[in-house]
Structures are given as structure tokens and as C-alpha cells.
Amino acid sequence: MLQCNCSILGDPETRDAMVVDPGDEVERILEILREHRLNVRAIVSTHTHIDHVGGLALLHAATKAPVLIHEADLELYRHLDMQAQFLGMRTPESMRIEDFVKEGDSVRWGGYAARVIHTPGHTPGSISLLVEKGQSSSKQGYLDRARPEPAKASAEAHLQAHLRGDAGDAVPGSVRGAATGPGRLVAGDTLFQGSIGRTDLWGGSMKDILNSIREKLLALPDETLVVPGHGENTTIGEERAENPYLR
């Protein structure tokens, strides 16, 4: 009904995958995973609105893969029943979530890693995921934790250092190795083609979402592909030039 974009990102060599925003149609997701012989290493939600987490518990039960959200959205997830009532739909199954990501963490599967960028505004715990191919900092597990950053380091400076590949030696939270081609940004409901996420729902903030986009997402190269939570793909360059909310 709500037509959320669910992303399945697989490594064709290792057959490992990450699933982002399983809002519904879990059987269809499982069918695609079986068709491509993919093993889910992690399930990530960019935020916990019901259209992005409606299938979370069922997919976790079927795959046993760890579920990751930003802790600032946990309270919103705990009120799925109220979200469902507001939309006039059934309450989906829920689960206990105890594993959280934060700014600078990297979720890994196969030869790929997704850098967590905290982009509050649509919700307090909204995140975007910068996906690149490269060797991550450790050989075991699915999550590299970010090293604590100096208090004065700006988010933009940290992102630019990461993109240059000089964010330090192989430390938790870094993605090492050259990227192959432009990065891919799974943006959730923060940035859309020609628009931005709603800020009139619980926890929303127009100031925060504009800061998230301008200070963090627009620090990425123009050729970065943006996969939004709804609608068509776009690029950072296209939104920098054409998005009316960013002028």
C-alpha cells in the first residue's frame, strides 16, 4: 500500500547480501534471495516508520540475520501499533531490537561495506548508507564500529577524508581499498528525486533534515547514485542542481 523501496544488495562472488528497509512482501524478498542464492548477513532499516519496518520481524525470523537500526528511532519502533492505527492498517509483527548503528559504523557483507551516515530530520534516528566495494577493516563479523572522533571534527571533513581513503589506518568504521566506480547512497526518506522527506510527523524537523542533506549528503561526489525510500533513483549532482528544497 505504501510502496517503500526495499534494497537487496548482494555480492555476486561471495553470495552475501544486505537487505535494507523490508517494509512488506517478505515472501517476495525471500524468493529473490533464493533465486540469486544470497545469504543475508544483515538487515538494516534507514528509519522505523511502519512502511520501512513492516516486514522486519518476519525477515529476521526467516533468515536469522541481525537487525540494525539507529537507537534514536527505537521509541518509534516500539509504537508500531500507533503507527498502524494512524494509517488504518494492521499492526505488523515486531521484535526486540538490541543492536544499533551510529555515525561512522560500517555494515559489511562479502566484499562490500555500507558506511552509516546519521541523517536526522525525517525521524530522529534516520540514517543513510553509503555503499562501496572495497576491503573492510576486519575479516570477521558484519559490523565495524567507528572509532570515536575528536569533538571538533566536522561531519563533512570526516566524510571527505573517508571518500579520499585517508581516514586513518584500518580502524573500526573505515572502509579500505579503492571504490570501483561511483558510490551508491541508500537514502531512506531523507532525500528524494526533486524533494526531501516529510518533517510533519513525530520527531521530524525541517531544520535537521536540511542540515543533514547540506552538511553530509551534499559532501558526496555529484556522480553518487541515490536510492531513495520511495520513487525513482537520482544522483547527488542532480539534486544539488535541481532540488527546490536545496536552493
Language-model features, listed with the residues they occupy:
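Conserved beta-strand positions that form and line the central face of beta-propeller blades
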Residues: I8, V19, L76, F100, ...
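Conserved beta-strand hairpin/beta-sheet module of binuclear metal-dependent hydrolase folds
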Residues: M1-H36, S128-E132, R184-V186
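Short catalytic-loop micro-motif centered on adjacent basic/acidic residues
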Residues: M18-V20, A42-V44, V116-H118
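Active-site HxH/HxHxD metal-binding segment of metal-dependent hydrolases
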Residues: E25-A113, E132-A153, A161, A170, ...
